[in-house]
Regions:
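Core catalytic lobe of class I
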Residues: 1-154
């Protein structure tokens, strides 16, 4: 069956310099689910955003805010600080926390086929979820091994 659920666009405020094409200012996260018929989503765990035109909605809606759309504005991971792993495509923990918290329950397992720096696994663990992280890049494996020393590492044969 078709297990693709949605595409999330992570737009950020940092733009690399280029004169040869439109500068890239976003990343894409493709969300797949094991069974679309039993997909779990808890909107109550998602921080709400302010309405862009508050005069067009009721005061109650303004006070509550709205559920974010599939385009999220976020800053990139700072070049220094506790969160930075040194992996070039690392995603901010806050982004993964929003996805994992709303899309899974404690004890569920989260799968990341392009795990990179392992942020998905680190966040999943902090939220009481299990994680299966997959990546074929030796640099990614090294970063994840340093980041999660207690994790079980298996390699494909």
């Amino acid at each position: 069956g078709q297990c693709f659920l949605t595409e999330l666009i992570l737009a950020y405020d940092f733009v690399g310099k280029t004169n040869k094409r439109w500068p890239t200012k976003h990343d894409t996260i493709l969300v797949y689910v094991k069974d679309p018929g039993s997909y779990y989503f808890d909107s109550a765990t998602v921080d709400r955003e302010p309405y862009m035109a508050p005069g067009l909605v009721t005061p109650e809606k303004v006070a509550r805010g709205k559920l974010p759309t599939d385009v999220w504005w976020h800053t990139i991971v700072p070049t220094s600080g506790k969160e930075k792993t040194g992996y070039p495509t690392q995603k901010p923990a806050g982004i993964l926390r929003r996805i994992i918290q709303a899309s899974s329950r404690e004890g569920d397992t989260v799968l990341d086929f392009f795990a990179g720096s392992g942020t998905t696994g680190a966040v999943a663990h902090s939220l009481g979820r299990n994680a299966v992280l997959i990546d074929d890049n030796p640099e990614a494996i090294a970063v994840m091994t340093r980041r999660m020393p207690g994790a079980t590492l298996r390699t494909a044969k």
